[in-house]
């Protein structure tokens, strides 16, 4: 009898370019043998990463210009992600980037919530960081320096440093042979 794998939901705004988008896809590829991995994205416009063989769900709520439209988008994304979480019942939801982190912490349906702080640009809004930390089980940092600053400057204690080893970083993003 096959053992049931834990369910992992990765949340990202888009997969068009950038560092955390690449980390999201690499994380899915690395963990897919041990977890039932699904990537949820807010828009499938201009996908730049190879997602063949991965379970990907487009929530189809792309970015909008203007404050009112952005606020409406937060509500739409929250509703859609909450529905997806209820359907998939993830054991862990890990989000990449401030936009995805916000929606992740606003949808506490089931399982653990992890939010990712990947750069100093993410640290520009202390009140948002405190919200992420308060509503996250773990705040995942890509460096010891960022984790230290979150603890020292903002009193955020639930941090972990997680990074891909050089072996994983140097691997190509094309799908592995079946």
Regions found by a protein language model. Name each.
Residues 74-77, 94-101, 117:
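Short His-centered aromatic/hydrophobic patch
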Residues 167-178:
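Single conserved hydrophobic/aromatic residue that forms the stacking wall/gate
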Residues 41-42, 94-95, 141-142:
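Short beta-strand scaffold positions
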Residues 5, 10-18, 22-71:
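N-terminal strand-loop element at the rim of the active site
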Residues 68, 85, 112-144, 154:
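A conserved, positively charged/aromatic
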């Amino acid at each position: 009898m096959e053992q049931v794998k834990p369910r992992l939901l990765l949340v990202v705004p888009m997969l068009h370019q950038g560092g955390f988008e690449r980390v999201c896809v690499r994380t899915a590829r690395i963990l897919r043998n041990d977890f039932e991995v699904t990537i949820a994205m807010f828009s499938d416009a201009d996908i730049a990463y190879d997602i063949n063989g991965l379970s990907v769900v487009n929530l189809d709520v792309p970015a909008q210009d203007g404050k009112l439209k952005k606020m409406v988008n937060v509500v739409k994304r929250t509703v859609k992600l909450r529905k997806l979480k209820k359907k998939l019942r993830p054991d862990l939801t890990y989000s990449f980037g401030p936009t995805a982190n916000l929606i992740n912490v606003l949808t506490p349906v089931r399982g653990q919530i992890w939010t990712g702080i990947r750069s100093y640009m993410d640290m520009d809004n202390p009140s948002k960081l405190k919200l992420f930390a308060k509503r996250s089980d773990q705040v995942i940092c890509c460096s010891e320096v960022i984790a230290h600053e979150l603890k020292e400057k903002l009193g955020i204690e639930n941090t972990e440093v997680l990074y891909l080893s050089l072996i994983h970083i140097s691997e190509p993003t094309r799908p592995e042979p079946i």
